[in-house]
């Protein structure tokens, strides 16, 4: 089936009947956007750790390796090569799975199945652990499981007259075969590609699920959700993962470590554990954007026997990050099924930026399709998909609405569930829909917190974490933050705490008319060279916060 046929899928609310094909013309009206070459990013940005900020090594005459920074053009070329190779790997896996129809290859769930299989196949530590545990289980008389294999649920398309639907099939692969195929395709170990996929899964989790249980477990208020980006990222995502993690996520990791150290006083005598703990705190310090926040982390780093006082300090730090936001990298991460289409989409540049025009142009050209679960509304599902791709779970909904020309709703108002279909819901004849929300305007992504305060808040999420660098007020619930400020500042670090609370109060006292990202504009999606900047229109009737009153499933309740 051609790409144009995908537009024919009816995008209504699913009930038990499969979707019917109806003649559609949206493919004809969608403009073909050719990606541009962006102006080189500033030197300031190239210092941050991310998949796009890599270095190459060259040999000196005496044979010693030195690090040479890549130019912006070299970076974009290497990123282009990475995403194209990921797409090639996806096509090879789909051939092995016997799924060759365009509709099957455009399906988000099939892309996720391949991504999960790849991550499982390349996680040698986990495989080793599973084998050892299974060996113990077998001795106790339990069933033997072959951990050299991994698999997933794919969806095969079935045509019935004018109706098309999808049926689930289980397919397994040898881990070693998958790993070899991936390394051969990438021409290396392909760690940057694996990290890219992990970030995509994390962004989708941030959008689809709440993390109130994870927050409460370490004594943090669920209203700090906007600081909790990247909370489901595995440790093996390394510095790339740290760059996209929110401050609250790192605070959570540190508090859990302190909890373990309090239960086992010998833990931090182990050099490996101590190094891991110090690394978390240093990453946290690097995230902080205010000297008062850094001073509080220094206080915790200097503690010989971390305990309750340190947990209180870190809790205050997390609260301060709602007002003075840390630096969180934002990236566009698309399903690898979209990267597989790059050769067919007329995407003829050999440069690609995950934070600029190219990624947004590719998103607009793509025709991704998703399985609809029982009760899902296709338009609402499209909103979830858009926010997942752009890592916009904690972005101001008014900004997203302005960029897409679609009124975005808070999570509690969306009639749809996450993209992962649990085993109990996998049935014959599942309907699907095109993810139809596209960008009408674009703006570069940001890694800054945009630290000027204003706006109104809600009872759930009380602050935003900016993703797009466009001038706007930063939404913040001042009332909710003031409740957080009423805490005891006595003790060993009264001055440090007092300074931080004063900074929060001073920031809160600013006029509500102050904007962040002064002078930054948006551009029409056809304006690849930023010729005509447009001021973003902020519609006051749309709520600021996606998780304002949350009714989403909790990530901890998932049954994979």
Curated annotation (Swiss-Prot):
GO terms for biological process: symbiont entry into host cell; viral penetration into host nucleus. GO terms for molecular function: RNA binding; structural molecule activity. Keywords: Capsid protein, Helical capsid protein, Host nucleus, Host-virus interaction, Ribonucleoprotein, RNA-binding, Viral nucleoprotein, Viral penetration into host nucleus, Virion, Virus entry into host cell. It is found in: Virion; Host nucleus. The record marks 7-8, 61-62 as: Cleavage. Residues 1-14 have a biased composition (Polar residues). Encapsidates the negative strand viral RNA, protecting it from nucleases. The encapsidated genomic RNA is termed the ribonucleoprotein (RNP) and serves as template for transcription and replication. The RNP needs to be localized in the host nucleus to start an infectious cycle, but is too large to diffuse through the nuclear pore complex. NP comprises at least 2 nuclear localization signals that are responsible for the active RNP import into the nucleus through cellular importin alpha/beta pathway. HAMAP family: INFV_NCAP. Homomultimerizes to form the nucleocapsid. May bind host exportin-1/XPO1. Binds to viral genomic RNA. Protein-RNA contacts are mediated by a combination of electrostatic interactions between positively charged residues and the phosphate backbone and planar interactions between aromatic side chains and bases. Belongs to the influenza viruses nucleoprotein family. This is Nucleoprotein. The gene is NP.
């Amino acid at each position: 089936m051609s790409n144009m046929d995908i537009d024919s899928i009816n995008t209504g609310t699913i009930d038990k009947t499969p979707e019917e094909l109806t003649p559609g013309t949206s493919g004809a009206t969608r403009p073909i956007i050719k990606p541009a070459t962006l102006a080189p990013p500033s030197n300031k940005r190239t210092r941050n750790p991310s998949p796009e900020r890599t270095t190459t090594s060259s040999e000196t005459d005496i044979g010693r390796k030195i690090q040479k920074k890549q130019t912006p053009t070299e970076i974009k070329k290497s990123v282009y090569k990475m995403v194209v190779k990921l797409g090639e790997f996806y096509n090879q896996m789909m051939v092995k799975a016997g799924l060759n129809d365009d509709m099957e290859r455009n399906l988000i769930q099939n892309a996720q199945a391949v991504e999960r299989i790849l991550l499982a196949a390349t996680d040698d530590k986990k495989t080793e652990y599973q084998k050892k545990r299974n060996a113990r289980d077998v001795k106790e008389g339990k069933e033997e499981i072959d951990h050299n294999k991994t698999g997933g649920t794919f969806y095969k398309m079935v045509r019935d007259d004018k109706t098309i639907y999808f049926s689930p099939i289980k397919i397994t692969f040898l881990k070693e075969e998958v790993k070899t195929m991936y390394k051969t395709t990438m021409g290396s170990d392909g760690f940057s590609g694996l990290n890219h996929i992990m970030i995509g899964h994390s962004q989708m989790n941030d959008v689809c699920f709440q993390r109130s249980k994870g927050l409460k477990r370490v004594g943090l208020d669920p209203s700090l959700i906007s600081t909790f980006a990247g909370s489901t990222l595995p440790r093996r995502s390394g510095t790339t993962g740290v760059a996209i993690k929110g401050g609250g996520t790192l605070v959570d990791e540190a508090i859990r470590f302190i909890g373990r150290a309090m239960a086992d006083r010998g833990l931090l005598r182990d050099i490996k554990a101590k190094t891991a703990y110090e690394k978390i705190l240093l990453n946290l310090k690097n995230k902080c954007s205010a000297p008062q926040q850094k001073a509080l982390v220094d206080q915790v780093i200097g503690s010989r026997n971390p305990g309750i006082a340190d947990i209180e300090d870190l809790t205050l730090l997390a609260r301060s990050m709602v007002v003075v936001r840390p630096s969180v990298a934002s990236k566009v991460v698309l399903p690898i099924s979209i990267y597989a289409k790059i050769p067919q989409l007329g995407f003829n540049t050999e440069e690609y930026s995950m934070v600029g025009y190219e990624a947004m142009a590719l998103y607009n050209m793509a025709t991704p399709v998703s399985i609809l679960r029982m009760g899902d509304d296709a338009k609402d599902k499209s909103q979830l998909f858009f926010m997942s791709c752009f890592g916009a779970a904690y972005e101001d909904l008014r900004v997203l609405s302005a960029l897409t020309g679609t009124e975005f709703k808070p999570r509690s108002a969306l009639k749809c569930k996450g993209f992962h279909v649990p085993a109990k819901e996998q049935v014959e004849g599942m309907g699907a829909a095109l993810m139809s929300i596209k960008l009408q305007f674009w703006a570069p992504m940001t890694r800054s917190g945009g630290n000027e305060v204003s706006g109104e808040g809600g009872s759930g999420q009380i602050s935003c974490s900016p993703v797009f660098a466009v001038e706007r007020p930063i939404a913040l619930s001042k009332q909710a933050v003031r409740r957080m400020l009423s805490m005891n500042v006595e003790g060993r670090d009264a001055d440090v705490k007092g300074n931080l609370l004063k900074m929060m109060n001073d920031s809160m006292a600013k006029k509500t008319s102050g904007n962040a990202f002064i002078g930054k504009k948006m551009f029409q999606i056809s304006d690849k060279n930023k010729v005509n900047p447009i001021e973003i229109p902020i519609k006051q009737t749309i709520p600021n916060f996606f998780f304002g009153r949350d009714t989403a499933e909790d990530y901890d309740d998932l049954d994979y």
